[in-house]
Amino acid sequence: MAVNRRKGQAIHLDLSMPSYDRSDAGNTRTSGMAELIKIAAGFATIGQGAGPMMVTWKAGLFKKHGLDIEKPRIMGGAKGVVRGLMTGEIQFGNMAAPAPLRSNVKGEADLIFLTGGINQQFVMARPGITGREQLTGKKIGFVGDGGLNDALVSFIIEKLAEAGIEGLQKEPVPGGGDRQIAALVSGSCDAIVITPPESIEARRRGCSYVIDFAEYVLNYALGGIAARRDYVEKNPEITRRFIKAYVEGMHRYRTDRDFTVNVQAEYSGIADRTAAEETYDLTRPGMPPVPYPIVTSLQVLLDFMTKEVPEAKNVDARRFVDDHFIRELEDTGFIASLDESRK
């Protein structure tokens, strides 16, 4: 049973949208008695990582906190999110960490992570391989687009070699979960890095989970909400409202299974509801109640990145994190109040 996207669903990048990069006093509209500030947000691709942002939007929490955000945009990958942030097409973006870190250290962008997020990743093996020790001398799919997949493939090859599982080679595969699964099941490669809900479909087709990146403290630290540094500095109140709404949305995600599953099935185009339910049940445990950016994990990525991006050498990941908005919410009791409200 495939994790089918609904027919006719398209990824559309509207690069003609106006920039809303303005001061806190700027672009507003009135809705009833409340004045809403109009901004734009987006995420890299359809998948579990975008779940909290879509739950926040669907639950009306951005409006609750004074922001007018149209449906968050699919930006066509992390590089698209970086581009959208830098051009002002969007003001806040959800994405995995490698692309913005690479752009930052190369001097192409100045982005900061404001929260952590969900980005659960696994290595799955083709039918017939049930353990990581069987990957010696085998092939692992490699997309080659410079994104998170590439970083994690290179990372796991090195980590397995350190553990005595040597000779795992990169094998080019097309991007997209469905095509990667096809390559895996057909034997074109022996393993792939994959994320829910596609990993659930792979398991249904006889593939096995052999590595959970949680072992390396990476699953909830590979990305999150990012913005341009100068935008945050010029618009602290807008940023504060966005993060407050997002944190409340993450709480709704963690505590309201039915609502989250419905939203996930809708925005992902998953026709099989059980796949959305399994995705939720797989990602919910361990999801942090306070979504701080994890500096130590970002540092792991930066240090590993030095092999391909020399500019990353000796760079401190703390340069690319601003967690004071999250700390405010925790220190003022807002986050604790969300749990109280569910009792």
Residue ranges and their predicted role:
Residues K234-N314:
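Secondary-structure end/capping motifs
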Residues T306-K343:
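Conserved C-terminal helix/tail region of periplasmic/extracytoplasmic solute-binding proteins
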Residues G49, K58, N119-Q120, G131, ...:
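Glycine-rich, flexible loop/turn motifs
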Residues V55, L61, I156-K159, E201, ...:
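Residues within well-ordered alpha helices
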Residues G32-D178, A183, D190-P196, C207-F213, ...:
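Short, glycine-/small- and polar/acidic-enriched structural segments
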Residues G137, A227-D230, G286:
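Short amphipathic alpha-helical segments at helix-loop
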Residues M1-L36, D339-K343:
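Short, low-complexity disordered leader/linker segments with a strong preference
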Residues R179-G269:
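Pocket-lining segment of extracytoplasmic ligand-binding domains
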